[in-house]
Amino acid sequence: MMARRDPTSWAKRLVRAQTLQKQRRAPVGPRAPPPDEEDPRLKCKNCGAFGHTARSTRCPMKCWKAALVPATLGKKEGKENLKPWKPRGEANPGPLNKDKGEKEERPRQQDPQRKALLHMFSGKPPEKPLPNGKGSTESSDYLRVASGPMPVHTTSKRPRLDPVLADRSATEMSGRGSVLASLSPLRKASLSSSSSLGPKERQTGAAADMPQPAVRHQGREPLLVVKPTHSRPEGGCREVPQAASKTHGLLQASRPQAQDKRPAVTPQPCPPAATHSLGLGSNLSFGPGAKRPAQAPIQACLNFPKKPRLGPFQIPESAIQGGELGAPENLQPPPAATELGPSTSPQMGRRTPAQVPSVDRQPPHSRPCLPTAQACTMSHHSAAGHDGAQPLRVLFRRLENGRWSSSLLAAPSFHSPEKPGAFLAQSPHVSEKSEAPCVRVPPSVLYEDLQVSSSSEDSDSDLE
């Protein structure tokens, strides 16, 4: 029976058994980790990762071959300047330097042409070259050469004469007279007197169309411009544009001594002119003194201000004519004005204290701006005992709410300039005929408005 057993067969069986054991140990697919290594609550002490322990073969610290080495993303040849350029010399200029050189040569070639044109227009001789042979190479040199004298800026400038007065001879300009108008001395201003009118305008008696410019002073106050003349009394109306100041009333000026021995002159209207503020009472001096005084009367005209807020009330184009400026006071009205009602006396009584001459005080600002004021001048022929004729002026003012008030104003005598209150109210004779009516509103409308507004003015005086 022992001979029947083959040793080769036994060896084959042993090999088969060993192969089967190897196949059982080595799995066909990936080996699943044991359940203890998959616990996320575990933490490796070597790498600090969760899911395995330090003894596990999954730890990258134990198997470095399995760890991936970080590879570079790429070379930075375009960003890094591995081969910097060398600075190019003038012998081998680059394309940018060539363009700059061409641009610099062009203006240098144009400099001689520009200088030639500059000398042609300015009329100056050409500049001599420098001894070292180096001229100005800047392209903006032609802008620095002045073609004419630089303007000189001064603070005080003389007023420009009108084109009509520009062709006057030197004799007429030297014969200009100076006129001093003495008013309430609230403020003082000095104005330059304008030239006399042309011979044609003297014959017609028309005022100059273009008003003379005057020096502008501080504040919004009226401006007074007086034009002396050496012609006969029929000369044109002198322009005295002036807006009423903050106190209510009108201004009067004293006449020259030459007028006291002459008859009354018919007043003529004056065109409106631009006005600037000076004040109610100011001492005005005009121009340089002449060899002889003015032989013609100075006729004042109060004209329209440019804006209503420049003065307490507006003055229409038809202004007061035939009289001069001065300090107004109350006068007893003539028989033609006695029917106007009691509204005139309290109003003028309130305004007279504000017009007392004072140097340091300013006009009060109590009353609001009144809309309009219209004045009329009537010839006042004095009786025996008065040398000259003095005009009598009636002032109509339009108050608030369409009310009207009237007042009588007369020019003072020239013999007593220190007393502005000396009026010609002593003369009982007053002509009833108005030589130069200035009021455009019918008298009946004024009388009705004054009679209706008498009670309202009394209430205003009580409130003030």
From Swiss-Prot:
Biased composition (Low complexity): 180-197
A Pfam family that the UniProt record links to this protein: zf-CCHC_6
Bias kind Basic and acidic residues: ranges: 74-89, 97-114
Region (Disordered): 1-42, 69-389, 415-437
Coiled-coil spans in chain: none
PANTHER family tied to this protein: FAMILY WITH SEQUENCE SIMILARITY 90 MEMBER A11, PSEUDOGENE-RELATED, PROTEIN FAM90A1
Recorded family membership: Belongs to the FAM90 family.
Further details from the record: Primate-specific FAM90A gene family, thought to have arisen during multiple duplication and rearrangement events.
Record's protein name: Protein FAM90A24
Gene name of the encoded protein: FAM90A24
